[in-house]
Design a protein with these regions (language model features):
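A low-complexity, Ser/Thr/Gly/Pro-enriched, surface-exposed linker/loop concept
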Residues: 28-69, 78-126
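Catalytic-domain carbohydrate-binding cleft regions of carbohydrate-active enzymes
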Residues: 19-56, 60, 154-829, 836
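Beta-strand-rich binding/interaction modules
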Residues: 82, 792-811, 912-931
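Accessory, solvent-exposed terminal regions and/or long lumenal/extracellular loops of proteins
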Residues: 33-44, 51, 60, 835-933, ...
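Fungal secretory targeting signals
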Residues: 1-20
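Extracellular/luminal ectodomains and secreted, surface-exposed scaffolds of diverse proteins
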Residues: 931-957
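Short, well-ordered beta-strand segments enriched in hydrophobic/aromatic residues
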Residues: 63-65, 86, 96-98, 128, ...
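Hydrophobic or amphipathic alpha-helical targeting/insertion segments
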Residues: 123-171
Length: 965
């Protein structure tokens, strides 16, 4: 076929464009009420299904589900014949899949997300979980084998759910009513609900910035409940709206008030369909509920037994894939802004960071780098290729790295003389998304008119890889890639460029005006634009004393506008998309991919598919090195390919706090390399906010300072106090790198979350279930940041209710805490960090300016004994860069009864010596020996019960014993 573009006749590769959706052939298999449209828009009369033709096997069961009565056609056409497959996937994982027997509904292809292989061992008789069902009407519930009499983990029986009808919990939005809880399976609408324990603890179901905090609002204790919409949307970090990614998994932490014990479980609905997920507790109800409302696809559930929170997360990882291996340099400090206008700006920034003694590992560039905002280009004046190459090689010579941005949209050439190979090569290879008629889908983004990659095209990976490689060959010798705008985001509705005169539209003009707006408690009209904490010796703080108010920013009202008609762009059920219509700020839902897939079905996976392609491309371009990738839009299994930053946040104190719940969320989603734009992206940061934020982010996995064009500079060297805070925090971070690296190795090998909510480690302490102003790095490092302006102290809770000793990271003093809220000193430039007892941490003794320099230096070991005098820890060591990971060495540290034993196993040879061993919680010894030989080089500090053994020069490739008596 032909498409007239830009005055040039492009011959498109012939493609068979049949039905624009897999559902188009459903009509012959659907039950119709004979009225066509409109649909009933109500599930009250939906009949549910009846189970029959049951076949059991060693690994589960298969059965047919038949519509139990006249079709209701609530928001689509009822599908009369379904199949249910139940598979005991492993000891801890149960898979329940309900799909149309004709296999016409969209199902996520294995090429996008590889599923676990069919089990070869029978778990049906000893699985942690049991599948129970009623045949008529069909319903199912999941129980624990160990406690079959307890309330089920998931229960779809209407008798277990609150009685209906339930009026709207938002009076202005009729769709927030619950008319009934039948199983509904239609071509454009699926619904299933489960009872939950009253007021139980639910986490996940993102991506979201929830006003309720890390724990989701389930409609009890004064809450209004939750509508979590899953439709990837490129918006600037609003609260209680759908965001960049879709992760329909939740973690339930269920506490038994009778026994005082808690257990965790998890539920994944593996679906890319747009959806609303409701969490609610109706008035006077004794149970809460979760309801899924989907606009396509199938019901593909995985249930995880836990019983610990970390085990649930790991079990989820075993299904969708464990996180990618991170290069060691990725844990360094990254610096970026939209507004580094040329290579000289980059060079000046790097020089200023070094002059201030603030470690800089990675320099980034935003879209300033591009020529006419086109991917895979550099501006010939501001960023000429040879100069960019020279700059990047200067970084590399100092063991530093460089990362550029890649937007999802690809510019369309404007006329016959316009040369842009990524676009024209893509046309030749037929790799761009199309309209239903086969013409190119053309939207508008930064470069002007643009096309979008069709990740289902068999040629897409080679075009993408070549574009990245050519860019690197031109001078942009990247170490990693930053993927942005990949929900995907557009600046117009539908295919607005189809048939347009491309030569009349150039790149969009970026924001060039000065950004206004400062953090709470800074009055720029009174104190000027510096953002300093003091001006002429006077404090600029302007809030009421001890104010801790957190105001909501743009909290949405529920109820997306419903457009009449039932087509792909406007499904009969209108999910609560923050932008309204599904095509707003993104592709139209009938945008068509290879194989006939439409955006309605695959929209939420666009970012994932780009991440996979980019990861594979980097592997090809930088062989034998671990790719480093940070992306905005994510979906289940994205962590195999990328890390994530929390999007376009604000330079506000509230967003400093919201940073924490985002990091905790993405540990659940198996995307542990995550962090926020430190000091905030939108608006101007001030000195105090940036001081506190640089400290906080030093204890999150991904550590990058980034802000918007036109805003005041916020690099950490801009204020003396921020520079000081940064040096202190980064020194602590780099000292802890062996610990961070071990946590991430465990994540890549077994799915264990590196960053943890407090209750993960202390599951039976209900006072911790809502704590999201503190967090744990691993099991042993407790972080308590300042989150409000004008503070010199901070309140924190120390888990363990007095049974655990927590020692200050800096002084090693024991905190006098009993599990209640404790007031800690927190002067400016200080963040409270505490070490758990019964721990042993391998550290870098001398943090260097770069990760390379730090890793080249000696190790130290910090042992924090508990009251019984024991401690335990592990470390994983390898070269930090090879892919696939090469030889490694596993270390264990175990202390008891005055003896520390270091065991070492593996093939990797650790060259650096262990030079210092510090043991906390010991009585003053009279003799210290290593390998049975008494030594003299030790000191003791009475106040902290601290034994320091210096200049040990112990190798870490064999067993070592330290004894104190």
């Amino acid at each position: 076929m032909f498409s007239l573009l830009l005055g040039v006749l492009y011959i498109l590769t012939p493609t068979v464009w049949g039905d624009i959706s897999q559902r188009a052939t459903l009509a012959n298999n659907l039950v119709s009420n004979g009225t066509g449209t409109p649909y009933s828009m109500n599930v009250t009369d939906c009949p549910g299904y009846t189970l029959g033709s049951l076949q059991e096997s060693d690994t589960g069961l298969t059965a047919h589900l038949t519509l139990a009565g006249p079709a209701c056609n609530a928001f689509g056409l009822d599908i009369s014949d379904l199949t249910i497959e139940v598979t005991y996937q492993s000891q801890s994982t149960l898979h329940v899949k309900i799909y149309d027997t004709a296999n016409q509904q969209f199902t996520i292809p294995e090429s996008v997300i590889e599923r676990p292989a069919a089990p070869t061992t029978s778990y049906a008789g000893n699985s942690d979980l049991i599948f129970n069902y009623d045949a008529t009407p069909f319903a199912f519930w999941i129980t624990r084998r160990s406690d079959p009499g307890a309330m089920p983990l998931f229960d779809t029986r209407t008798s277990s759910l609150p009685p209906t009808p339930i009026p709207p919990f938002n009076a202005s939005d009729a769709s927030t009513a619950f008319d009934g809880f039948p199983l509904v399976f239609e071509d454009q609408y699926l619904q299933v609900a489960s009872a939950l324990p009253y007021g139980t603890n639910i986490y996940g179901l993102g991506e979201v910035i929830a006003s309720s905090g890390f724990r989701r609002d389930i409609g009890t204790n004064g809450g209004v409940g939750t509508i979590q919409t899953h439709w990837s949307l490129g918006v600037s970090d609003p609260i209680d709206q759908n965001l960049y990614g879709s992760h329909p998994i939740y973690l339930e932490h269920r506490y038994n008030t009778t026994t005082g014990k808690a257990s965790a479980s998890g539920v994944l609905l593996l679906s890319s369909a747009g959806s609303d997920i409701f969490l609610q507790t109706p008035p006077n109800s004794k149970v809460s509920l979760i309801e899924y409302r989907m606009i396509g696809g199938i019901l593909d559930f995985y249930f995880f037994s836990g019983p610990s929170d970390a085990e649930v997360i790991a079990q989820y990882g075993s299904v969708i894939g464990y996180p990618m291996w991170q290069p060691a340099w990725g844990f360094g400090f990254h610096l970026c802004r939209w507004g580094y206008h040329n290579v000289s700006d980059d060079r000046e920034n790097v020089a200023q960071m070094r002059a201030a003694g603030i470690p800089l590992e990675v320099q980034w560039n935003d879209i300033d780098l591009y020529h006419a905002y086109r991917d895979f280009t550099t501006d010939p004046v501001s960023f000429p290729g040879d100069e960019v190459r020279e700059f990047i090689q200067e970084l590399a010579a100092n063991h530093q790295h460089y990362i550029p941005i890649v937007d999802a949209a690809i510019a369309v050439t404007r006329n016959s003389t316009d040369v842009y190979d990524p676009f024209t090569r893509g046309v030749e290879e037929d790799v761009w998304i199309k309209n239903p008629d086969g013409s190119l889908y053309i939207a508008e983004v930064w470069p002007g008119y643009t096309v979008f990659p069709d990740w289902f095209s068999e040629n897409m990976l080679s075009v993408w890889t070549d574009s990245l490689k050519n860019w690197s060959d031109m001078g942009v010798e990247f170490s990693g890639i930053w993927l942005d705008m990949n929900e995907p985001s557009t600046f117009c509705s539908y295919s607005c460029g189809t048939g347009a005169n491309f030569s009349s539209v150039g790149p969009l003009t970026d924001v060039s005006s000065v950004v206004i707006g400062y953090p709470e408690c800074y009055n720029e009209t009174l104190w000027g634009p510096s953002g300093n904490m003091t001006v002429n010796g006077t404090s600029t703080y302007s809030c009421a004393a001890n104010s801790t108010t957190m105001t909501l920013v743009e909290k949405r009202g529920v109820g997306a506008g419903r457009e009449e008609g039932a087509d792909l762009n406007n499904p009969p059920y209108a999910i609560h998309n923050a932008a309204g219509s599904l095509n707003q700020h993104s592709l139209a839902s009938n945008a068509t991919y290879s194989g006939g897939y439409v955006d309605l079905d695959v929209h939420n996976m666009f970012g994932l598919m780009e991440e996979k392609a980019t990861h594979l491309a980097i592997q090809s371009i930088l062989p034998e090195k671990r790719p480093f990738l940070i992306s905005r839009s994510t979906f289940p299994s994205a962590g195999k390919w990328t890390g994530h930053w929390l999007g376009d946040n604000f330079s506000k104190w509230q967003y400093l706090y919201l940073n924490i719940q985002g990091v905790l969320q993405f540990q659940i989603y198996q995307i542990p390399m995550v962090g926020a734009d430190t000091c905030g992206f939108n608006g101007n940061a001030d000195e105090e906010l940036c001081n506190r934020w640089m400290q906080l982010s030093a204890f999150t996995p991904f550590y990058r300072n980034h802000n918007t064009n036109g805003a005041l500079p916020q690099e950490p060297y801009r204020w003396d106090s921020v520079a000081n805070a940064s040096r202190i925090a980064i020194a602590a971070r780099y000292a802890m790198l062996p610990y961070w690296y071990t946590l991430f190795a465990n994540s890549s090998m077994a799915g264990i979350p590196p960053v943890r909510a407090l209750f993960y480690e202390f599951p039976d302490e209900p006072e911790l279930f809502t704590v999201d102003k503190q967090w744990l790095v691993g099991s042993d490092i407790l972080v308590t940041p300042v989150l409000t302006p004008g503070a010199s102290t901070v309140e924190g809770i120390f888990p363990g209710r007095g049974s655990v000793m927590w020692r200050d990271w800096y002084t090693h003093a024991v905190v006098n805490a009993t599990g209640q809220s404790t007031t800690l000193d927190a002067p400016i430039s200080h963040i409270n960090v505490h070490i758990r007892d019964n721990s042993a941490l391998l550290l870098h003794q001398v943090p260097g300016y770069t990760i390379y320099e730090t890793r080249e230096g000696p190790y130290s070991l910090l042992v924090s004994l508990n009251a019984a005098g024991t401690a335990f820890g592990t470390a994983y060591v390898d070269d930090g860069i090879s892919f696939p990971p090469g030889p490694s060495r596993s270390l264990t540290f175990q202390a008891a009864e005055g003896t520390l034993v270091i065991d070492s196993n593996g093939e990797y040879e650790i060259v650096q010596m262990l030079e210092t061993i510090t043991v906390l919680g010991v009585q003053k010894p009279t003799q210290v020996a290593i390998q049975g030989s008494p030594i003299e080089g030790w000191t003791y500090k009475e106040a902290t019960e601290e034994l320091v053994v210096s200049n040990t020069s112990v190798g870490l490739n064999g067993q070592t014993t330290l004894v104190w008596r």
